[in-house]
A protein has these predicted regions:
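Trp/Phe/Arg-rich N-terminal binding region typifying the photolyase-homology
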Residues: 1-157
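Glycine/tryptophan-enriched, flexible segments
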Residues: 137, 142-215
Length: 215
């Protein structure tokens, strides 16, 4: 997902083109409900990772004087509500292609005013889809061939510059609390301290893992 501040298309362009910006995250309720198979779509390990990631994101955004709105309601309810209350003019979000995510996106678009400018983008790939040198029907069936062609013919796009810190007046007066594991029906737990792969959530930890892996 795109829960980071650095090299983020939406964050960079919103900061560049809008006088005030706010970040929004929804804990979609149905992802934490029991399924007919007797387990949740999002269980305790993934939930802990997500909570850690949001704590990191909230801290990073606060350094830029940007509020992270954390919502326990569906985005189909929360986004239209905050668009109205905060008088939002532009909405930035990452494109997805899977059904559940697109159902949410479609519902949000139907629920908000057509005057809202919607900006969508692909920000989750090493290579941007528009930069791939293959036509759709000519993409190799074998990954190695695809990879070698991309390495030879396609350049990874440059990262977006870091945004300038907003004035403190950009922050909302309300402080949004990140839920705890217990709020989702899980008991608090701690990964084994001797684990070789603790995988703590958050972009800073992600960068550190990448650095350790490559260097």
């Amino acid at each position: 997902n795109d829960l980071r501040v650095k090299d983020h298309f939406g964050f960079y362009n919103a900061a560049k083109n809008c006088d005030k910006i706010f970040a929004y995250f929804s804990f979609e309720p149905d992802k934490f409900e029991d399924t007919k198979w007797g387990f949740k779509k999002t269980e305790k390990f993934r939930t802990l990772f997500l909570i850690q990631t949001l704590k990191c994101l909230k801290d990073e955004l606060k350094k830029k004087n940007v509020t992270l709105i954390v919502d326990i309601n569906s985005a189909t309810v929360g986004i239209p509500k905050f668009i109205d209350s905060l008088k939002i003019t532009d909405l930035f979000y990452q494109n997805e292609w899977t059904k559940e995510e697109n159902d949410i996106s479609d519902s949000v678009k139907k629920a908000i005013s057509k005057k809202i400018k919607i900006h969508t983008y692909y920000d989750q790939f090493l290579y941007h889809p528009e930069d791939i040198s293959f036509e759709l029907d000519a993409i190799p069936e074998v990954f190695t061939i695809f990879r070698k062609s991309c390495e030879k013919n396609t350049l990874v796009r440059k990262v977006f510059p870091e945004i300038t810190t907003f004035p403190s007046t950009n922050l909302l007066d309300e402080e949004f609390t990140i839920p705890r594991l217990g709020d989702f029906g899980f008991s608090e737990f701690y990964p084994p301290p001797f684990s070789a792969f603790p995988f703590t959530g958050g972009s800073k930890n992600g960068y550190n893992r990448l650095k350790d892996y490559l260097w």
